Every structure is written in structure tokens, then in C-alpha cells.
Amino acid sequence: MKRTIIMMLDSFGVGASADAASFGDVGSDTFGHIAKACAEGKADIGREGPLKLPNLARLGLGHAAMESTGAFAPGFGDNVELIGAYGHAQELSSGKDTPSGHWEMAGVPVLFEWGYFSEHQNSFPKELTDKILARAGLDGFLGNCHASGTTILEELGEEHMRSGKPIFYTSADSVFQIACHEETFGLDNLYRLCEITREELAPYNIGRVIARPFNGTGQSDFARTGNRKDYSLEPPAKTVLDKLKAAGGEVVSVGKIADIYAYCGITKKVKANGLEDLFDATLAEVKSAGDNTIVFTNFVDFDSHYGHRRDVAGYAKGLEYFDARLPEMLALLGEDDLLILTADHGCDPTWQGTDHTREYVPVLAYGAGLKAGSLGRRNSFADIGQSIASHFKLEPMAYGESFI
């Protein structure tokens, strides 16, 4: 029975990529800087001491990062019995965003330029927002800027509740984000507003509209809920997910995967929020998955809760939790199953600002007859998609080189 399980650690980069200078990210290193902070006792909130990831180390994480950066991260070295194949991959796509990374790892790199709202203030064209407001029956909006999602709630959340005006904001990514209170504005109203915005953005080539619902009574207790929803464009070509579905296979999305691919190639969507819930749901789907199935999970907390918020200790604690549960996954795998652990970009929690970082991503592969050892530097995330196509004996993808 052949299956593929993809555990996507959102934002878990392993060192600045060769083209990082074009993004202002030379020197960034999500994994390495977390390990360094832990070793120096600078990440002892909710955990303590050096970064402890013994299971990821056995799968080759430390070695993949060493090949990426030229040195082992603090606390990692050769004194480990490797059980997996490991490498690191360069992104071919033009951006360091979520859709680009996900589509490329499924065999479809983004070779065009996304549209962006580059102005930090008055970010959105008036012509665009006027159309959105008119269709939605709203008399105004708040924000209109680049912002951290948590900071903008502190600044504008109470005014939003008083006025009923949605909060529009963006970032360095190709994204239009809308934050609204679940109770005072209404979740369905937020989703409808996002659908309108997605339609009006057609001429702008923006990758995603993101619904950012929150709750709470005031500035001190505002918090995002688990009802985030991404409205993505469709990938520009058929991904390996589409190809497996067309061949009669199953593709199970856990978390926000379905949204990122605009539901293309997805046969089942499982909603889950938080590391524990996402891991539980992944295990449950693997237990019930039949032949010719992909189970694909995005562990978004690493990015949204820790990377963007520049929370080094939180990121480290999350990684250690994930690592401690990996034996549960390994115990479920048959001899023909393929497990892949990777990331879609970096988001170094020690870096300036709050945006993603252009980094190599780890490619850790286990099972399906793969020998433990180095896969080297992969020239594209698409090598993952090509390898999955090879594993299922599908028609080859247009991009990528299989490591199987």
C-alpha cells in the first residue's frame, strides 16, 4: 500500500538562500537562530535549555541545516544515528509567500510576479476599496496599511467594534487581509466580504485574501479565532495533487492546505487548529488512509504564532512538542509509505520586522525504500512533487527532479 504523508512545518527555514540578498534576508536562519537562542539561555519561557529535537535529528534535520549553512546548529552534530534521507531546497518561485512555496512543492513553481500593495500607508487603491465597500454595503473601513495582525487589533479593534467598519491591512506578501469581530460583525459577513474582495482583486494578481476573525471584549483580550479562511488563486497548472486525484487517488487536506490550493486536487478537507489538534487529526487520517493517498498537513502555528510574532521561545517549544510526537507518526508507516517533512519559506523569529525570510527549506524523507543519507541541495521545491509523482507512478511533473 503506497501512501505519502507531508508534514509541512510552515516557515521552518534552514538558512538564507543563495538569492536572499534580493529580499533583504542575508543572514536569516530560522532553525539556526532558534537553536542558538536556546543554547544561550535566551528562550527559557515555557521551556528551558538547549533545543531538543532528537527525532527530527535522526531524520536528518541537523545535517540538512549543516549542508545549507556550512555549520551544525548549536546542540546538533554527527553524534546521531540517521534513519532518514535529508536535503535542503532552494525556492525557484519569485516570492517567499505561502502559495508560492506550497504550489512549488507540489510541482508548480510560480514563475510570474505577484501583485503587491507596496505602500506602507494608504496601501490600497481608492478605486478598489470603493468597489468593495459598495458591493458589501459598507460605509467605510479601517487600517489601509502594512501591519502585524496582532498589533492592528490592539490599535483598531475597539474602533472596529464601535463603528462596524472592517479592518483592511496587508504586508510584504501578496495579500489582502480583513480582520473583523466574529460576534459584532459576524463570521458569515466577514467571509462574504472576503469573497467580494477576492473577485474585485482579479486585475491586481494578488495571491490571497485572508479572513482574520477575532473575538474578545477590548484591547486587553482580543484574540484571533480558529476560523481563519484563505481565498487563494488557483495554481497556474496541475499539481501532483491534481494528478493523483485524476488517477483515482485520495488527497486529504488537514488544516489550511485546501485553501492554499483553492481546493484544486483535494478530495477531503479536515479542519483542525493548533499544533496538538493538527497532529491528532493527521494521525487519525493516516490510520484510516487507504492505498494511493496523500495526507497533507500545514502546521501553521510555527508561522502565525511564533515566526511572525518573533516569539523565539514559543517557536522552540512548538518544535519540541512536534518532535516528541513524531514517534507516533513513524509507528503508523508501512514499508511503502513515504513521509516528507519540509517547509514553504522561512520566518526567522530573531529577524527584523515581522515578515517571512527567504531561506532554504529542509527536505526530510523517510520510508519507501529510501536510504539514510544526504540528498544534497535541491534546485527547486518541485523536487518534492516530482518525487511524489514517482512514488505513485504518475506522469512526471514539468518541474523538479525526483530523489526516489
UniProtKB/Swiss-Prot annotation:
<feature type="binding site">
    <location>
        <position position="344"/>
    </location>
    <ligand>
        <name>Mn(2+) 1</name>
    </ligand>
</feature>
<dbReference type="GO" id="GO:0006018">
    <property type="term" value="P:2-deoxyribose 1-phosphate catabolic process"/>
</dbReference>
<dbReference type="GO" id="GO:0005829">
    <property type="term" value="C:cytosol"/>
</dbReference>
<comment type="function">
    <text>Isomerase that catalyzes the conversion of deoxy-ribose 1-phosphate (dRib-1-P) and ribose 1-phosphate (Rib-1-P) to deoxy-ribose 5-phosphate (dRib-5-P) and ribose 5-phosphate (Rib-5-P), respectively.</text>
</comment>
<comment type="pathway">
    <text>Carbohydrate degradation; 2-deoxy-D-ribose 1-phosphate degradation; D-glyceraldehyde 3-phosphate and acetaldehyde from 2-deoxy-alpha-D-ribose 1-phosphate: step 1/2.</text>
</comment>
<dbReference type="GO" id="GO:0030145">
    <property type="term" value="F:manganese ion binding"/>
</dbReference>
<keyword id="KW-0479">Metal-binding</keyword>
<dbReference type="Pfam" id="PF01676">
    <property type="entry name" value="Metalloenzyme"/>
</dbReference>
<dbReference type="GO" id="GO:0006015">
    <property type="term" value="P:5-phosphoribose 1-diphosphate biosynthetic process"/>
</dbReference>
<keyword id="KW-0464">Manganese</keyword>
<keyword id="KW-0963">Cytoplasm</keyword>
<feature type="binding site">
    <location>
        <position position="10"/>
    </location>
    <ligand>
        <name>Mn(2+) 1</name>
    </ligand>
</feature>
<feature type="binding site">
    <location>
        <position position="308"/>
    </location>
    <ligand>
        <name>Mn(2+) 2</name>
    </ligand>
</feature>
<dbReference type="InterPro" id="IPR024052">
    <property type="entry name" value="Phosphopentomutase_DeoB_cap_sf"/>
</dbReference>
<comment type="similarity">
    <text>Belongs to the phosphopentomutase family.</text>
</comment>
<feature type="binding site">
    <location>
        <position position="356"/>
    </location>
    <ligand>
        <name>Mn(2+) 2</name>
    </ligand>
</feature>
<feature type="binding site">
    <location>
        <position position="345"/>
    </location>
    <ligand>
        <name>Mn(2+) 1</name>
    </ligand>
</feature>
<protein>
    <recommendedName>
        <fullName>Phosphopentomutase</fullName>
        <ecNumber>5.4.2.7</ecNumber>
    </recommendedName>
</protein>
<dbReference type="GO" id="GO:0009117">
    <property type="term" value="P:nucleotide metabolic process"/>
</dbReference>
<dbReference type="InterPro" id="IPR017850">
    <property type="entry name" value="Alkaline_phosphatase_core_sf"/>
</dbReference>
<dbReference type="GO" id="GO:0043094">
    <property type="term" value="P:metabolic compound salvage"/>
</dbReference>
<dbReference type="GO" id="GO:0000287">
    <property type="term" value="F:magnesium ion binding"/>
</dbReference>
<dbReference type="InterPro" id="IPR006124">
    <property type="entry name" value="Metalloenzyme"/>
</dbReference>
<dbReference type="GO" id="GO:0008973">
    <property type="term" value="F:phosphopentomutase activity"/>
</dbReference>
<dbReference type="InterPro" id="IPR010045">
    <property type="entry name" value="DeoB"/>
</dbReference>
<keyword id="KW-0413">Isomerase</keyword>
<feature type="binding site">
    <location>
        <position position="303"/>
    </location>
    <ligand>
        <name>Mn(2+) 2</name>
    </ligand>
</feature>
